[in-house]
Amino acid sequence: MAPVPEPINEMMAYYSDENELLFEADGPKQMKSCIQHLDLGSVEVGNIQLQISHQLYNKSFRQVVSVIVAMEKLRNSAYAHVFHDDDLRNVLSFIFEEEPVIFETSSDEFLCDAAVQSVNCKLQDREQNSLVLASPCVLKALHLLSQEMSREVVFCMSFVQAEERDNKIPVALGIRDKNQYLSCVKKGDTPTLQLEEVDPKVYPKRNMEKRFVFYKTEIKDTVEFESVLYPNWYISTSHPEEKPVFLGHFRGGQDITDFRMETLSP
């Protein structure tokens, strides 16, 4: 009959000095001593739990020693230890791996879900000319009599998304109760102002196209509207009455770029 290998000798064949590095904090000498006196089964010594499993392999017994570092190390310490944030951080650092989180710019489909804030207002230039619709797509500056004030256009000014600038608020100017917005387009080489028809199911929205967006700047008791698409071009009126509102490149002189704004209650 073939001799059965001694359990201790078979166990030590699977033991390596490298294991001492893993349990150096608990004392490698104590670890070796515990292994030399193990019986078959499961043993718990101090802070370390040892389990021995049996497996039949090639018609001979082999013992596999698995060393499990138990969480009892914290609870069975010889001294009272309060579990601090650093302890939890150390535990989690072994479980989770830190990775950078990259934030991408939100697309318009998400921005459109955000409510667009707006106010109703009327605009008069510094010469007290009111803005009126002379035709469905033509906006003019006229001096109105008191009985004609009902002709004055009411704007729905929406606060929209754009690159931030000091003391400049990005807005879009739509005509209330109409699907029309002031927009800036180029005709030839010159930026021009027009009234553009839009889809009421889509507009207004937070991320308006640049042609619809103006920087509103407050100067004392007046405001200016500068095109975002064409910097230094402003919504303007001219001194002669009944001229269309246009996009002007000059401030002062014949071009009037400053307006008094009257905010209306909802």
Curated annotation (Swiss-Prot):
Keyword Amino-acid biosynthesis assigned: no
Gene Ontology process terms (BP): cellular response to lipopolysaccharide; cytokine-mediated signaling pathway; fever generation; immune response; positive regulation of cell division; positive regulation of immature T cell proliferation in thymus; positive regulation of T-helper 1 cell cytokine production; positive regulation of type II interferon production
Q: Where is this protein localized, as stated in its record?
A: Cytoplasm, Cytosol; Secreted; Lysosome; Secreted, Extracellular exosome
> GO molecular function terms here?
cytokine activity; integrin binding; interleukin-1 receptor binding
> What PROSITE patterns has UniProt attached to this entry?
INTERLEUKIN_1 (PS00253)
Q: Which UniProt keywords apply?
A: Cytokine, Cytoplasm, Inflammatory response, Lysosome, Mitogen, Pyrogen, Secreted
Question: Which parts of this protein are propeptide?
Answer: 1-113
A cellular component annotation (GO) from this entry: extracellular space
InterPro entries reported for this sequence: IL-1_CS (IPR020877), IL-1_fam (IPR000975), IL-1_propep (IPR003502), IL1/FGF (IPR008996)
Does Cytoplasm appear among the keywords? Answer: yes
Signal peptide feature range: none
Give the stretches traversing the membrane.
Answer: none
Q: Where is this site: Important for interaction with integrin?
A: K168, K178, K187, K201
Q: What else is known?
A: IL1B production occurs in 2 steps, each being controlled by different stimuli. First, inflammatory signals, such as LPS, stimulate the synthesis and promote the accumulation of cytosolic stores of pro-IL1B (priming). Then additional signals are required for inflammasome assembly, leading to CASP1 activation, pro-IL1B processing and eventually secretion of the active cytokine. IL1B processing and secretion are temporarily associated.
What function is annotated for this protein?
A: Potent pro-inflammatory cytokine. Initially discovered as the major endogenous pyrogen, induces prostaglandin synthesis, neutrophil influx and activation, T-cell activation and cytokine production, B-cell activation and antibody production, and fibroblast proliferation and collagen production. Promotes Th17 differentiation of T-cells. Synergizes with IL12/interleukin-12 to induce IFNG synthesis from T-helper 1 (Th1) cells. Plays a role in angiogenesis by inducing VEGF production synergistically with TNF and IL6.
Family under the similarity heading? Belongs to the IL-1 family.
What PANTHER family does the record point to? INTERLEUKIN-1 BETA, INTERLEUKIN-1 FAMILY MEMBER
* Complex and partners: Monomer. In its precursor form, weakly interacts with full-length MEFV; the mature cytokine does not interact at all. Interacts with integrins ITGAV:ITGBV and ITGA5:ITGB1; integrin-binding is required for IL1B signaling. Interacts with cargo receptor TMED10; the interaction is direct and is required for the secretion of IL1B mature form. Interacts with HSP90AB1; the interaction facilitates cargo translocation into the ERGIC. Interacts with HSP90B1; the interaction facilitates cargo translocation into the ERGIC.
Q: What is this protein called?
A: Interleukin-1 beta
Organism encoding this protein: Cervus elaphus (Red deer)
Taxonomic placement: Eukaryota, Metazoa, Chordata, Craniata, Vertebrata
Gene behind this chain? Answer: IL1B
